[in-house]
Every structure is written in C-alpha cells, then in structure tokens.
C-alpha cells in the first residue's frame, strides 16, 4: 500500500457549490403553470408581483414550486457530521469510499470556540465553555488516538487485510468528502433543524459541527435565491 500524506488536524468544514439550476424565477414559473398552463413566460427578472408570489407560497406552505431548483455541493467534513447529514432522506448522496481507496489521515479537532461541557438532561440541556485544562486534554487525547488508529490501519493494509475491514479501526473524526444534490424545498427543511436562529418559529439545537456546515450551505443558497431566502426568513424559517 502506498501512502503519501502526513497526518493533518483541522477544525474546518468546507462547502463548495459544484453546479446548480437554482433561481427565484424557477419558483415563479413552476407555480404559475397551475393557472397559466403553457403560456408561462420564463424570465430571470422578477417583478414585485413575482416576489409577492414567492412570499405567498412560503406563507401558505405551497411547497412543490420550490422543488424545481437544484444544487450540488461538495462537502468535506468529519464522518460524524455526515452521519447526521444523511439522516435527512431528502437529498442524493455520494461519499468517498473506504472500500475502494486508502483513506487519508485528515482528522477533525474542535477549535477553542467549541463549548465542551453539557449542563442538564437530554432534551433540556445547554453547553458551556470548558476550562483550558479540559480543552488541552481533549486535543491531546484526540490527536494521540487518531494517530494510533491510523498507524494500525496502515499495518492492517500492509498485512493484506481488505480496505473495507481495515477501515473499521478508524475514528469518527476522520474527514470524508461527499457530493450532495438537493432541491430548495428540501434544503429549507434541512436548514430549519440544523441551524439555530432567534427568529425561528421552531427553535432547534443542532450540534455545532453540522451547524457550521449548514451555515456555509445557506450562505451559498442565499446568493442563488435571495427572494426565496428572504421569504424563508420572514416566515420563521419553516420549510413550505
């Protein structure tokens, strides 16, 4: 087995827009076909009436017109983030395979902004800052165990053990990469539960790492569909 990369520890999650067919006008012409049939004029120039229609659809939760806008993202994040992401069975996923390639030694470690201490019972808890001693211990242990696991992974592969078996030794903070294709309606559902906002009609308490991922996705989507995003915000971030 051939390994060319030294171990790397990161505290970042990266999101890149690969391609899209997503605009506010997609919502408008998809909705208006209901009443105008084949006479719908497709244009990227929105009138005030068009913007009002988007707001109406969002408020009244007429969701299907929002399904005609699609985005594909390339995301690099630790495996535990992807396991939460894929609970949303409303997107298409293809992930880097540990069966078919050697996995790179890139590991996630929390930065110092990460709150470490859980206070309260499940369903009614909050997180507070940890001490410098707690943070130091966490990082020391994570790095030590990550390196030990990866060394074992390499030894298993060198002994002829299959990738799909050897990978079982690797920890959840290992980075992976996946492509996600999702429509705007499904994306709003994802954002409604994976972000925490003061104006949300239904408050959510996402894990910090998946919220970082969601924040980056939302910023990209907002640039593609600003009027749809504004309507989403106005209606308390409830998916239609």
UniProtKB/Swiss-Prot annotation:
Cofactor(s) required for function per UniProt: FAD
MF (Gene Ontology): flavin adenine dinucleotide binding; NADPH binding; thymidylate synthase (FAD) activity; thymidylate synthase activity
Binding site for FAD: 64, 87-89, 95, 183-185, 189
Sequence motif ThyX motif, residues: 87-97
Domain ThyX: from-to ranges: 13-235
E.C. numbers: 2.1.1.148
Cofactor-binding details, from the entry: Binds 4 FAD per tetramer. Each FAD binding site is formed by three monomers.
Keyword annotations of the record: FAD, Flavoprotein, Methyltransferase, NADP, Nucleotide biosynthesis, Transferase
Pathway(s) of this molecule: Pyrimidine metabolism; dTTP biosynthesis
Entry-linked PANTHER family: FLAVIN-DEPENDENT THYMIDYLATE SYNTHASE (PTHR34934:SF1)
Subunit structure: Homotetramer.
Protein name in the entry: Flavin-dependent thymidylate synthase
InterPro entries for the chain: Thymidylate_synthase_ThyX (IPR003669), Thymidylate_synthase_ThyX_sf (IPR036098)
Catalytic activity: dUMP + (6R)-5,10-methylene-5,6,7,8-tetrahydrofolate + NADPH + H(+) = dTMP + (6S)-5,6,7,8-tetrahydrofolate + NADP(+)
HAMAP family noted in UniProt: ThyX (MF_01408)
UniProt family annotation: Belongs to the thymidylate synthase ThyX family.
Species the sequence originates in: Tropheryma whipplei (strain TW08/27)
């Amino acid at each position: 087995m051939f390994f060319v990369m030294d171990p790397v520890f990161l505290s970042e999650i990266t999101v890149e827009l690969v391609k899209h067919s997503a605009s506010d006008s997609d919502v408008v012409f998809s909705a208006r076909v209901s009443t105008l049939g084949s006479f719908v004029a497709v244009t990227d120039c929105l009138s005030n009436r068009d913007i009002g229609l988007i707001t109406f659809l969002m408020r009244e939760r007429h969701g299907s017109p929002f399904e005609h806008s699609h985005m594909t993202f390339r995301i690099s994040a630790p495996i535990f983030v992807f396991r939460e992401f894929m609970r949303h069975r409303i997107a298409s996923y293809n992930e880097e395979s540990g069966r078919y390639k050697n996995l790179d030694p890139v590991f996630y470690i929390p930065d110092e902004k990460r709150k470490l201490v859980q206070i309260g019972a499940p369903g009614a808890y909050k997180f507070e800052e940890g001490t410098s001693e707690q943070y130091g211990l966490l990082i020391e242990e994570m790095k030590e165990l990550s390196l030990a696991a990866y060394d074992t992974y390499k030894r298993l592969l060198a002994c002829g053990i299959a990738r799909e078996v050897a990978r079982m030794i690797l920890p959840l903070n290992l980075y992976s990469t996946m492509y996600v294709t999702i429509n705007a309606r499904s994306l709003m559902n994802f954002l409604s539960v994976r972000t925490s906002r003061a104006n949300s009609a239904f408050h959510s308490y996402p894990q910090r790492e998946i919220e970082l991922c969601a924040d980056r996705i939302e910023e990209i989507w907002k640039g593609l569909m600003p009027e749809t995003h504004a309507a989403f915000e106005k209606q308390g971030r409830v998916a239609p």
